[in-house]
Design a protein with these regions (language model features):
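Hydrophobic alpha-helical membrane segments
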Residues: 1-183
Length: 183
């Protein structure tokens, strides 16, 4: 009975739908990046098969038309995948930061009873307009703390995660103050 108590909560549906919609949008924005990673793995597989078929690889005759065709195909897949990864990351990161305030907005709107999934996502985009780079810089400043968590096998997370989340909450509160002054 207690294991299903979460689903009885009146906020569950709004929370679930909002977070699902956020993840779905971010998935769509990450498709070029994922396609680039797929092609990168495929080009790696092609290179491995080539080396298996040509054990004399370092001294292979590059004037052979078959080998030349393979190298051109490999280069196309490899550089195409790198291009897709770079472009995909450039597309994904601004969208990631546009939706970075969704969870905090959700907490605020659930408390007053006006949480709607699409509205919460739109509000997050509005709040972050012009402030995505500042949030990116904040995340870069917190990167050493994540590294410390990693090298301590998660033990340091007990004291570091509250610091990281506090910084993100202070950023959100400051963002609300700035946007309220502008409106």
């Amino acid at each position: 009975k207690d294991s299903l108590a979460l689903f009885d909560n009146r906020f569950f549906t709004q929370t679930f739908l909002t977070l699902l919609l956020k993840r779905f949008y971010l998935f769509l924005w990450s498709l070029p990046n994922l396609l680039g990673v797929y092609y990168l793995f495929y080009s790696n597989l092609m290179a491995r098969k080539f080396v298996e078929l040509h054990p004399e690889f370092p001294s292979v005759d590059l004037t052979n038309p078959d080998i030349e065709q393979f190298l051109l195909t490999f280069a196309l897949y490899f550089f195409g995948s790198v291009f897709l990864i770079v472009i995909g990351t450039a597309i994904y990161l601004p969208q990631y930061y546009a939706y970075s305030q969704v969870e905090l907005l959700l907490c605020d709107t659930l408390a007053i009873g006006i949480a709607k999934p699409s509205r919460t996502l739109q509000t997050s985009r509005f709040l972050m307009k012009g402030y995505k780079f500042q949030r990116f810089v904040l995340d870069l400043q917190l990167l050493p703390w994540y590294f410390l968590i990693w090298i301590s096998f998660g033990i340091a997370s007990i004291s570091i995660y509250p610091y990281i989340y506090s910084n993100q909450i202070f950023f959100y509160q400051r963002l609300l103050e700035i946007k309220r002054r502008k409106v």
